[in-house]
């Protein structure tokens, strides 16, 4: 089974970018609540 590196990178970025964005918002919200 051939692994498409570009497809893998695109998928990783598509998942990681929104996750990192939400994580930053979550951390800021928790910090404000304190």
UniProtKB/Swiss-Prot annotation:
Membrane topology value: Single-pass membrane protein
Compartments where found: Plastid, Chloroplast thylakoid membrane
Statement: the UniProt record of this protein carries the keyword RNA-binding: no
Residues annotated as transmembrane: 5-25
Gene Ontology CC entries for this record: chloroplast thylakoid membrane; photosystem II
General function of this protein: One of the components of the core complex of photosystem II (PSII). PSII is a light-driven water:plastoquinone oxidoreductase that uses light energy to abstract electrons from H(2)O, generating O(2) and a proton gradient subsequently used for ATP formation. It consists of a core antenna complex that captures photons, and an electron transfer chain that converts photonic excitation into a charge separation. This subunit is found at the monomer-monomer interface.
Subunit structure: PSII is composed of 1 copy each of membrane proteins PsbA, PsbB, PsbC, PsbD, PsbE, PsbF, PsbH, PsbI, PsbJ, PsbK, PsbL, PsbM, PsbT, PsbX, PsbY, PsbZ, Psb30/Ycf12, at least 3 peripheral proteins of the oxygen-evolving complex and a large number of cofactors. It forms dimeric complexes.
HAMAP family per UniProt: PSII_PsbM (MF_00438)
Protein's name according to its UniProt entry: Photosystem II reaction center protein M
């Amino acid at each position: 089974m051939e692994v498409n590196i570009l497809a893998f990178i695109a998928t990783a970025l598509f998942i990681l970018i929104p996750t990192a964005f939400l994580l930053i918002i979550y951390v800021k919200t928790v910090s404000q609540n304190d």
